């Protein structure tokens, strides 16, 4: 039996307290993590040895059960990713671990220098060598292969080199059993906390530019760069978490605290950089149209996961499957209705809409259909010339598969899957027909959906 030298752990499985956590949970996690480490490729002896140390600490210090449970949970979810060989999964594994540390201890400094810290440090060693180097290079190369940007390209080589050198240096220094003041000085000289800032700063600049762009290709580039930015910030934090633990090992607590503070500041800066995504203004609707619907894009889903970690407020209220009333912001007594005109079905603004009359249905790919529920089944679609036609087809096609872009003032903008940069608006005419306008149509294209 894997834990035969700790039989008492199994005898007291039912012991539970809010402070200490369930022993049954930590037992299960210990077994899963140990099995995963033994099955993983590569050299995991150090991690297995550290796991044994963690078991011993749980035996002698019951108050560590709760902390160990949370850390083992984050490590367990990360192990398969760290050994996957896939850059995106590896960085997602990094996120699992740093998020686990942040929620359990408030940061690496709070971990102390006990068995939990040693175990986490040994797990970080699984990727801070060649995996970190290869992952950083892979996500940078992937983003730049899709978007030509000479300024970013110039800084990319330096960023890849910085990550590679720093991770390799930390790995070597972790092999030292006793760190001297001289060793700590060498570490500080070779892994300064400000490394990687140039490239991350360049990405912040591109994100800022792309936020207000009127070019669909630039908006797509900005969203891809947002994902790259999130990945690099997390990789940087992961390296510095390992660095902070290393300083604690050398009893340089003031330096470890400084590193942790640098991480905290950079996490706040990342939140500031990404905050606009969930508080869009109309001029940022195009990047919002690339980002939404989040469930339709693997890139957007990954970004959302990172924003939660950085502390960015959630996306505003999502649209559900039910009837809504779409009221125009410019003519706030007019809402969308339909009419028959010369054999065609048209959508327009009407002043006599009292009840929700547009049925919104979410499709499996995350987009929506908008169907008039007052008369025969009509889907709103964008015609090639911009008209909001009604179609009787069961599936209106990507001309009628809609996305809703939430704005910070509670209104929405609407565009189709085929033309993400053409937004639904109510035209200035006696008929008030519903049409589409390229980029921000102003308040005529802002809708209150109730």
From Swiss-Prot:
* GO BP term, pick one: monoatomic ion transport
Question: After translation, how is this protein modified?
Answer: Contains disulfide bonds.
Q: Carries keyword Transport?
A: yes
Signal sequence span is 1-18
Recorded GO molecular functions are: toxin activity
Q: Name one GO cellular component term.
A: nematocyst
Compartment(s) of residence: Secreted; Nematocyst; Target cell membrane
Q: Which UniProt keywords apply?
A: Cytolysis, Disulfide bond, Hemolysis, Ion transport, Membrane, Nematocyst, Secreted, Signal, Target cell membrane, Target membrane, Toxin, Transmembrane, Transport
Q: Where does it primarily localize?
A: secreted
Instruction: Report which superkingdom the organism of origin falls in.
Output: Eukaryota
Distribution of this protein across tissues and organs: It is suggested that CrTX-B is synthesized in the tentacle, is modified (become CrTX-A) and then migrates to the nematocyst.
Supply any other comment. Answer: CrTX-A and CrTX-B are encoded by the same gene. However, they differ by their molecular masses (43 and 46 kDa, respectively). In addition, CrTX-A is primarily localized in nematocysts, whereas CrTX-B is only detected in the tentacle without nematocyst.
What's the family? Belongs to the jellyfish toxin family. Type II subfamily.
Subunit structure of this entry? Oligomer.
Q: What does this protein do?
A: Has potent hemolytic activity. Is lethal to mice and crayfish. Causes cutaneous inflammation in humans. May act as a pore-forming toxin, disrupting normal transmembrane ion concentration gradients in susceptible cells.
For this entry, the protein name equals Toxin CrTX-A
According to the entry, what is the taxonomic lineage of the organism? Eukaryota, Metazoa, Cnidaria, Cubozoa, Carybdeida
């Amino acid at each position: 039996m894997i834990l035969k030298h700790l039989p008492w752990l199994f005898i007291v499985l039912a012991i539970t307290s809010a402070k200490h956590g369930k022993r049954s949970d930590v037992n299960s996690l210990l077994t899963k993590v140990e099995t995963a480490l033994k099955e993983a490729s590569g050299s995991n002896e150090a991690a297995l040895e550290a796991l044994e140390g963690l078991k011993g600490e749980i035996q002698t210090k019951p108050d560590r059960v709760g902390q160990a449970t949370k850390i083992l949970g984050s490590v367990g979810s990360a192990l398969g990713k760290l050994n996957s060989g896939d850059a995106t999964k590896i960085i997602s594994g990094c996120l699992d671990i740093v998020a686990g540390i942040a929620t359990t201890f408030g940061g690496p400094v709070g971990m102390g220098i006990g068995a939990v810290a040693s175990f986490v440090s040994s797990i970080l060693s699984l990727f801070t060598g060649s995996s970190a180097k290869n992952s950083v290079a892979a996500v940078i190369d992937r983003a730049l292969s899709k978007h030509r940007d000479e300024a970013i390209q110039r800084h990319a080589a330096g960023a890849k080199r910085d990550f590679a050198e720093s991770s390799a240096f930390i790995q070597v220094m972790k092999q030292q059993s006793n760190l001297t003041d001289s060793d700590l000085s060498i570490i500080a000289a070779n892994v300064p906390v400000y490394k990687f800032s140039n490239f991350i700063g360049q990405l912040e600049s591109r994100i800022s530019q792309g936020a207000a762009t009127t070019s669909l290709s630039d908006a797509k580039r900005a969203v891809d760069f947002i994902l790259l930015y999130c990945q690099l910030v997390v990789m940087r934090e992961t390296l510095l978490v390992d660095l902070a633990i290393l300083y604690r090992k050398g009893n340089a607590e003031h330096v470890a605290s400084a590193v942790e503070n640098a991480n905290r500041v950079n996490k706040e800066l990342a939140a500031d950089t990404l905050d606009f995504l969930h508080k869009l203004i109309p001029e940022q609707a195009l990047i919002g149209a690339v980002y939404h619907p989040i469930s339709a894009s693997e890139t957007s889903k990954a970004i959302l996961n990172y924003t939660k970690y950085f502390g960015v407020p959630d996306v505003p209220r999502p649209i559900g499957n039910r009837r809504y009333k779409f009221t125009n912001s410019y003519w706030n007594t007019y809402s969308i209705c339909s009419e028959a005109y010369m054999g065609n079905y048209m959508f327009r603004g009407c002043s006599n809409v009292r009840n929700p009359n547009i049925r919104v249905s979410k499709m499996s790919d995350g987009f929506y259909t908008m169907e008039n529920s007052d008369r025969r089944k009509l889907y709103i679609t964008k015609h090639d010339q911009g008209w909001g036609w009604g179609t009787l087809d069961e599936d209106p096609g990507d001309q009628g598969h809609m996305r809703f872009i939430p704005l910070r003032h509670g209104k929405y903008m609407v565009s189709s899957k085929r033309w993400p940069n053409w937004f639904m608006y109510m035209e200035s005419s006696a008929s008030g027909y519903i049409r589409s306008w390229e980029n921000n149509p102003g308040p005529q294209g802002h809708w209150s959906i109730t």
